[in-house]
Amino acid sequence: MSFKFEAEVRSAQGKGASRRLRHNGQVPAIIYGGNAEPVSIILDHDKVNNVQIHDAFYNEVLTIVLAEKEVQVKVQAIQRHPTKPKLLHLDFKRV
């Protein structure tokens, strides 16, 4: 099973910017590792939330399309809301 997500580069940083993203149905994330600089990105919350129920999401290499360039990543960490079924932040590591 392969997973592919469309992402945007995130320009606004901080708690307020992250809250605005979550309120608009998006989730902040970061891609780090490899020989490149870390990149803050924005993903669609519902798309990620619907596929994260599969075990393969955590074990397989995922593809993130960022500025028409594909980046191969694995899930490193996920932060979830303590009482709601919401994702707060995702960390991806380049493969």
From Swiss-Prot:
Belongs to the bacterial ribosomal protein bL25 family. CDD domains: Ribosomal_L25_TL5_CTC. InterPro entries: Rbsml_bL25/Gln-tRNA_synth_N, Ribosomal_bL25/Gln-tRNA_synth, Ribosomal_bL25_short, Ribosomal_L25_dom, Ribosomal_uL5_bac-type. This is Large ribosomal subunit protein bL25. GO terms for molecular function: 5S rRNA binding; structural constituent of ribosome. Part of the 50S ribosomal subunit; part of the 5S rRNA/L5/L18/L25 subcomplex. Contacts the 5S rRNA. Binds to the 5S rRNA independently of L5 and L18. The keyword Ribonucleoprotein applies. Keywords: Ribonucleoprotein, Ribosomal protein, RNA-binding, rRNA-binding. Gene3D superfamilies: Ribosomal Protein L25, Chain P (2.40.240.10). It comes from Haemophilus ducreyi (strain 35000HP / ATCC 700724). This is one of the proteins that binds to the 5S RNA in the ribosome where it forms part of the central protuberance. The keyword Cell membrane does not apply. GO terms for biological process: translation. NCBIfam families: PRK05943.1. One of its GO terms (cellular component) is cytosolic large ribosomal subunit.
